[in-house]
């Protein structure tokens, strides 16, 4: 079509072919734009409608916001969440700084950071589909950038399912938590002394 348009230049057929070419191109652009928008994953964060780009990692982050937070961090504010394409989808620099964060360009934020103001708790959450659980080394890295933070710190690794959790179980640090998106009502606590004790009969 492009070649035919060029060949028709300076001829009577040029205007007609140009019109047909532009119409076809506009339809093509609309088609691919629509497809791209359909692939995005809508998510509501801090009462704001946003979109994650497609992918397993972002699917898990979406589950953290929509399923973990209401169950285990009710009324929490999302201070940070990344995206596989747009690195910082949400980053409340002012609030993070007020809480005592020291963030440099070299620091790698956890995938999701939630803050519960009523309890003064911060949830650091790594969404793991292939790499990056809350290992002892990762805890040290986060502690370094949060030396000035006085709020209570909770370290969580989120996995999509049990099989992924089992792959990384030996890397996980003690005194951290695990959440599985396939079993959203439950947590795995890697620090028995704090939660050990009989439960009331149901």
Describe the function of each predicted region:
Residues 1-41:
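Short, amphipathic alpha-helical interaction segments positioned at domain boundaries
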Residues 64, 68, 75, 92, ...:
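Conserved catalytic cores of phosphodiester-cleaving nucleases, focusing on short active-site segments
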Residues 53-59, 79-118, 131:
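Active-site metal-binding core of divalent-cation-utilizing nuclease and nuclease-like domains
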Residues 77, 121-124, 151-158, 176-178:
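Hydrophobic beta-strand segments of well-ordered beta-sheets in folded domains
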Residues 148-149, 159-202:
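Domain-level recognition of nuclease-like catalytic cores that cleave nucleotide substrates
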Residues 81-83, 115, 125-128, 156-160:
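Short His-Asn-centered micro-motif
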Residues 128-172:
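Accessory, usually C-terminal, subdomains that scaffold auxiliary metal cofactors
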Residues 42-87:
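Hydrophobic, aromatic-enriched interface-forming segments
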């Amino acid at each position: 079509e492009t070649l035919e348009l060029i060949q028709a230049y300076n001829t009577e057929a040029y205007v007609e072919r140009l019109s047909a070419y532009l119409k076809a191109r506009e339809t093509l652009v609309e088609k691919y734009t629509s497809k791209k928008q359909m692939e995005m994953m809508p998510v509501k964060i801090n009462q704001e409608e946003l979109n994650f780009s497609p992918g397993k990692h972002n699917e898990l982050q979406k589950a953290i916001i929509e399923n973990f937070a209401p169950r285990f961090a009710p009324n929490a504010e999302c201070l940070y969440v990344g995206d596989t394409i747009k690195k910082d989808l949400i980053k409340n620099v002012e609030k993070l700084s007020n809480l005592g964060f020291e963030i440099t360009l070299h620091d790698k934020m956890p995938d999701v950071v939630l803050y519960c103001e009523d309890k003064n708790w911060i949830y650091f959450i790594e969404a793991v589909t292939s790499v990056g659980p809350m290992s002892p080394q990762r805890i040290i890295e986060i502690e370094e950038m949060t030396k000035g933070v006085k709020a209570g710190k909770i370290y969580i690794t989120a996995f999509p399912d049990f099989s992924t959790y089992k792959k990384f179980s030996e890397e996980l640090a003690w005194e951290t938590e695990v959440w599985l998106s396939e079993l959203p009502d439950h947590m795995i606590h890697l620090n028995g002394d704090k939660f050990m004790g009989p439960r009331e009969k149901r």
